[in-house]
């Protein structure tokens, strides 16, 4: 039993429960306990499951980033390579060096948030502007080795609990359309 800090779900090795809520997982365990003659209350099942999962927290994103750091040869500039995929509007008057600096800060912030235990909040949002079909969403998934680490078209109203839960269950999210 372990707790995935990215998707905020309890996981049990050997059981495919990826689509289940934490409450459903606890009820499943309660049923297994009762089938095997164990007398345990629903409340205790929830408490024990939460305690065990809390002691076994992990982040697949952090694991991936740590492995990527070990594999990095120190020579290739992957950030600059990614930046080369973007085009700034020449009529906007934007300073390309400053925009690249902000892009790097955003990437660093994404990595910091992966390792964050809740003490910090992200500073800044990467905003990609352009016509449909030019690759803005594709860029999101280019960053992510596993599609389930990201979400697209998310809308966030901080007053709506479900919006907050949905948006925080991923490493990187693409927010829905912005107005001009």
Can you say where each PLM-predicted feature lies in the sequence?
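N-terminal nucleic-acid engagement/recognition segments and initiation subdomains in replication
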Residues: 1-77, 81, 94-101
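Residue-level preference for alpha-helix termini and adjacent loops
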Residues: 2-5, 9-14, 85, 113, ...
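Generic detector of intrinsically disordered, low-complexity, polar/charged segments
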Residues: 11, 28, 34, 130, ...
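P-loop NTPase catalytic core of nucleic-acid-dependent motor ATPases
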Residues: 53-172
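Conserved AAA+/SF3 P-loop NTPase catalytic/coupling segment centered on the Walker-B
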Residues: 170-180
């Amino acid at each position: 039993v372990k707790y995935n800090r990215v998707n905020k779900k309890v996981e049990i090795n050997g059981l495919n429960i990826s689509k289940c809520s934490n409450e459903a997982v606890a009820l499943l365990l309660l049923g297994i306990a009762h089938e095997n003659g164990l007398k345990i209350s629903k409340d205790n099942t929830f408490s024990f499951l939460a305690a065990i999962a809390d002691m076994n927290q992990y982040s697949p994103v952090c694991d991936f980033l740590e492995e990527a750091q070990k594999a990095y040869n120190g020579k290739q500039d992957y950030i600059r390579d990614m930046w080369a995929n973007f085009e700034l509007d020449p009529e906007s008057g934007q300073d390309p060096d400053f925009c690249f600096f902000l892009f790097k800060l955003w990437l660093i912030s994404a990595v910091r948030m992966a390792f964050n235990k809740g003490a910090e909040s992200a500073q800044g949002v990467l905003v990609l502007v352009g016509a449909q079909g030019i690759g803005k969403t594709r860029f999101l998934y280019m960053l992510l080795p596993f599609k389930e680490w990201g979400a697209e078209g998310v809308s966030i109203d901080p007053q709506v609990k479900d919006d907050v839960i949905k948006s925080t269950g991923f490493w990187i999210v693409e927010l829905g359309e912005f107005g001009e």
